[in-house]
Amino acid sequence: MSFVAGVIRRLDETVVNRIAAGEVIQRPANAIKEMTENCLDAKSTNIQVIVREGGLKLIQIQDNGTGIRKEDLDIVCERFTTSKLQTFEDLAMISTYGFRGEALASISHVAHVTITTKTADGKCAYRASYSDGKLQAPPKPCAGNQGTLITVEDLFYNIITRKKALKNPSEEYGKILEVVGRYSIHNSGISFSVKKQGETVSDVRTLPNATTVDNIRSIFGNAVSRELIEVGCEDKTLAFKMNGYISNANYSVKKCIFLLFINHRLVESAALKKAIEAVYAAYLPKNTHPFLYLILEISPQNVDVNVHPTKHEVHFLHEESILERVQQHIESKLLGSNSSRMYFTQTLLPGLAGPSGEAVKSTTGIASSSTSGSGDKVHAYQMVRTDSRDQKLDAFMQPVSRRLPSQPQDPVPGNRTEGSPEKAMQKDQEISELPAPMEAAADSASLERESVIGASEVVAPQRHPSSPGSSRKRHPEDSDVEMMENDSRKEMTAACYPRRRIINLTSVLSLQEEINDRGHETLREMLRNHTFVGCVNPQWALAQHQTKLYLLNTTKLSEELFYQILIYDFANFGVLRLPEPAPLFDFAMLALDSPESGWTEEDGPKEGLAEYIVEFLKKKAKMLADYFSVEIDEEGNLIGLPLLIDSYVPPLEGLPIFILRLATEVNWDEEECFESLSKECAVFYSIRKQYILEESALSGQQSDMPGSPSKPWKWTVEHIIYKAFRSHLLPPKHFTEDGNVLQLANLPDLCKVFERC
């Protein structure tokens, strides 16, 4: 059998270029890296990247750099054409990102490329299209800003195997974000943005005036930025300088985040990474890694940048000595970091099972299991030693001393029945004293609470929040207004009367559906079965659920509570009635005098604005009274406020600002009128720290009242507000993310730390 020698042929230039392009441009992220470096070489200060389908369908990168001269557009996409290098010796002193002239050429061999560019001295921009490195047609003049816009379409359209291998657009988009994010951190004086085509919000966005730490925070989050240590060292003997940021011993992740720039070029160094991680091994838990952002500036003649087609590797002289010097400096910075740790509370979903998946067992459950003979052993760290159904004695000791405006006195029977067909269900209630700002508006210092059931147009559907597992649903009635007899609600809201109006108004029903859709059942279960621990201050309180302790934002939760009551009990509120009318003009003047109003002389005289507010609210008086029980008479006096929860009166110090915001912040002419009005009412009724008097201000009046609580607002928070949370609040999902519900401790975790329970 004879073998015939193969014929050696010269490859076609197109084949050669396409093979080379496959080495340089391995995926969309490589193309964006090369073009981003071109933008930086062009002295750009604003770089915008838009992609579609992970960059496989479209890549668009725009800068405001120097642009490309019209004369150079003919050869800009040919191989080995560059403005940064002339002789081979220039490589020894190269300081730019590009030097071979292969990037645009390689991209044009595997995609359709269009370049639109304008120089500072050019009268107009020029657009040109390229394929296989060649100009398709003479450049055409067009409108454009200074800089360059490169559009890359159908990447790897002629390399089918490569395109099939890159079949996950989301993965490719993630790599694009990673590349641009790293360059944005290293170039803190330049604005970067990356977004998908058609999206309005950028996934990466940095500002030109942002610092390096700001950009790290924007890309990697606060968890990294607040644990950074600045590093820096220099060795003239080795001709190198190092600086950057590394994470301290408080921060660790499962995968090392290593940003390395050598002479401002993004590269990789497995040896340097291994050396630094060896230092961190003494400080971080096993199988966790640090965040590292290092900049090495080495004398250019000591660096060989022409090592790899993608330029992600470089070689340099004295590598071992430089790595050892960097390792020693980082070790000195971390020295002593192991002496302390800082722990941050994070928002956790209440009620989720622990890592072991073991169910939490209460003491009542222990008794039942022992009687049934199950024989299950319950560990101390699993026991729940409280019962949310237990009542406290002080729940029956409502404060009777001089109290805050938000604390009602004991009910006083009354005979008012106007507007209500059910006289037997009416109640009256007074408050001993209005706050100091109210004294200027009304000489009288008492409020009467009167249950008023109107009989007009649109009202709230019946709901049963106290029934376990119940959900709020809209009623299918055809008419906009109906009356319902024998409402089965027996809870705390003011609309608990035998006769109710039923709503079918689309705007209100949609708000109810929105509340249902954003509700979080796990949070609801926690609030329904919580055990109140105590108030930290008027804004924060502690509550226990099973074996976990939570810190709850009373202000935000009460605001959401009152908003939901206003929406679900729409037009079914009782009335807190002032026995003597309070002028709206005086309220408006008090509000405008407050810095919170933001009034300036440019807004005009306060008296004129106050008169406008009075006249405006008088026009809305009928709707306010019918739907929200905010009663205003013909003379412009406030005579009633809605009764949302039994035995609760809002902090009346906020009434002037509430009146002002009713006239200025509510979208009266928009479809969102009911929503914005309800939100303003909810803010007014919520527990707010600035309106709660301190104990020192009340000690003189309360010292002679034995048996009464020292701080009546605490009684209100525990026995009125948090009691209402159990049955009336469907907490939204965002409460698990925005810090309004924080898990502070978990009994099993505490037992691991202290080795006892």
Swiss-Prot record:
Matches recorded under PROSITE patterns: DNA_MISMATCH_REPAIR_1
PTM comment, free text: Acetylated. Deacetylated by HDAC6 which prevents the MutL alpha complex, formed by the MLH1-PMS2 heterodimer, from being recruited to the MutS alpha complex, formed by the MSH2-MSH6 heterodimer, leading to tolerance of DNA damage.
Region (Disordered): 355-378, 400-434, 456-487
Top-level taxon of the source organism: Eukaryota
Quaternary state and interactors: Component of the DNA mismatch repair (MMR) complex composed at least of MSH2, MSH3, MSH6, PMS1 and MLH1. Heterodimer of MLH1 and PMS2 (MutL alpha), MLH1 and PMS1 (MutL beta) or MLH1 and MLH3 (MutL gamma). Forms a ternary complex with MutS alpha (MSH2-MSH6) or MutS beta (MSH2-MSH3). Part of the BRCA1-associated genome surveillance complex (BASC), which contains BRCA1, MSH2, MSH6, MLH1, ATM, BLM, PMS2 and the RAD50-MRE11-NBS1 protein complex. This association could be a dynamic process changing throughout the cell cycle and within subnuclear domains.
Entry binding sites for ATP: 38, 63, 82-84, 100-104
Organism annotation: Rattus norvegicus
Renumbered residue ranges of the record's region Interaction with EXO1: 412-652
Name of the protein in question: DNA mismatch repair protein Mlh1
UniProt modified residues of type N-acetylserine: 2
